[in-house]
Amino acid sequence: MTAYTQTTDSMLREGESLDALGSEGLRIIQSIRGFRHSMDALLVAHFAAPRPADRVLDLGCGNGAIALLLAHRHPPLRVVGLEIQPALASQALRGAQVNGFQDRLEIVEGDLRRIGSLLPPAGFDLVLCNPPYREVGRGRLNPDPERRQAKHEMSATLQEVIAAIRYALAPKGRACLIYHASRLADLLTRLRAERLEPKLLRPVHSFLGADAELILVEARREGRPGLRVLPPLFVYQARGGGLSQAMDEIYRDLAPTLVRSGIA
């Protein structure tokens, strides 16, 4: 385990870039050719709607996009990010520093399968996660190791991810995830097996008439049964068109200049 609080490293290393992440000078450090943040981070950060007093964990935080967005949008919030890849954990740490969030954003380098030796049990009111969508052996493996590990279950299966969420959540705490729609049944089954009751679900479509590609799910530890399915979110007005009104409102609420910075 490595808990980063300060570093003497230069802000940028070879093969990295410092890019805009929303408004008012928010920046993110990321690999030029490796893993880079996507719209998924924006969607789950907005969906989670944290409360000011929430203790927040970004499980598998990558380069820190979700944690940075939350820290920027909700100034009192304190966020812990857990990431297994050392290079990405370092990027998240340095991203916190370059944005002045080092007092509110802690990055822990470690394996979520060993979360019991890294973080306290039931220590968080809200856990966010954007887990790898593909099982090993399904689909073409990305040749880049950072992207491969982010997209395929190379380091942890869905079952292991959900078990780590269950460990970290306080009683009645919330878990918010974004996942591929084709694996919705797997996700809901695993959540219930860990006594994380699905409470909210929102399908995400590219445009009207397209199948859902992603799903946003909120589950509550030891919550009562009862799932509310929210209206679908359409990212674009039409195939090849501009952002939908709903998506534009999400951008304006969370990070108004992300479209110009290239995330969309």
Residue ranges: model-predicted function:
Residues 1-17, 30:
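N-terminal auxiliary segments of SAM/dcSAM-dependent transferases
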Residues 29-50:
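Conserved SAM-binding loop and adjacent beta-strand
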Residues 30, 109-110, 179, 202:
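Short loop/edge segments at beta-strand edges and connector loops
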Residues 44, 130, 161, 219:
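Residue-level signal for inorganic ion chemistry
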Residues 47-140:
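Conserved SAM/SAH cofactor-binding pocket of Class I
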Residues 131-160, 164:
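Mobile active-site "lid"/loop adjacent to the S-adenosyl-L-methionine
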Residues 155-205, 212:
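Conserved Class I SAM-dependent methyltransferase catalytic core
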Residues 211-264:
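SAM/dcSAM-binding transferase cores
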